[in-house]
């Protein structure tokens, strides 16, 4: 059996902290305004995984009203979300993350981002794709006010998929 989940997140720039994207500190003059570390990519990916497993959403698992998640490392949130997904009997088939940002440029960090996600999801890097695009200077991302991210996750229940082979 397979399941597909979609996640979306957005954060505005404006806080004096590192800019974390896919668990990587991307050099930039500002960080995100957020309750946690604001990693839009890992939040979108966590939401995609949680949604695919029908476990609700990231706000249900990690509410921003709970002080234990204040300045939380989003890698830890992703790992915990995936632990809960695995408890349902599913594993990652593949994930695809799209970062939507006018700046900073993501290209130099994409391989590192893929590796971080593969490590956190305990899967082969070939199961992880990260890409970046702009909105051609349109909207809030185009004006450089923040970053948006979408993610899709395919989950597989290995016991029910005889053709599945964890690479």
Swiss-Prot record:
CDD domains: MECDP_synthase (cd00554). Its EC number is 4.6.1.12. 4-CDP-2-C-methyl-D-erythritol 2-phosphate binds at residues 9-11, 35-36, 57-59, 62-66, 133-136, 140, 143. The record marks 35, 134 as: Transition state stabilizer. Signal peptide: none annotated. It comes from the Bacteria. It holds the Pfam family YgbB. A divalent metal cation binds at residues 9, 11, 43. Pathway: Isoprenoid biosynthesis; isopentenyl diphosphate biosynthesis via DXP pathway; isopentenyl diphosphate from 1-deoxy-D-xylulose 5-phosphate: step 4/6. Its cofactor is a divalent metal cation. Involved in the biosynthesis of isopentenyl diphosphate (IPP) and dimethylallyl diphosphate (DMAPP), two major building blocks of isoprenoid compounds. Catalyzes the conversion of 4-diphosphocytidyl-2-C-methyl-D-erythritol 2-phosphate (CDP-ME2P) to 2-C-methyl-D-erythritol 2,4-cyclodiphosphate (ME-CPP) with a corresponding release of cytidine 5-monophosphate (CMP). HAMAP family: IspF (MF_00107). Homotrimer. NCBIfam families: ispF. This is 2-C-methyl-D-erythritol 2,4-cyclodiphosphate synthase.
């Amino acid at each position: 059996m397979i399941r597909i989940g979609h996640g979306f997140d957005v954060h505005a720039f404006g806080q004096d902290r590192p800019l974390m994207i896919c668990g990587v500190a991307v050099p930039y003059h500002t960080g995100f305004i957020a309750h946690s570390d604001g990693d839009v990519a890992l939040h979108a990916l966590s939401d995609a995984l949680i949604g695919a497993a029908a476990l609700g959403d990231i706000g249900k698992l990690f509410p921003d009203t709970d002080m234990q998640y204040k300045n939380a490392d989003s890698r830890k949130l992703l790992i915990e979300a995936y632990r809960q997904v695995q408890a349902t009997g599913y594993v990652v088939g593949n994930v695809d993350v799209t970062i939507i940002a006018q700046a900073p440029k993501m290209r130099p960090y994409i391989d590192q981002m893929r590796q971080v996600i593969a490590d956190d999801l305990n899967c082969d890097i070939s199961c992880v794709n990260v890409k970046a695009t702009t909105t051609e200077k349109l909207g809030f991302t185009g004006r450089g006010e923040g970053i948006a991210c979408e993610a899709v996750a395919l989950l597989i229940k290995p016991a029910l998929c005889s053709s599945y082979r964890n690479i």
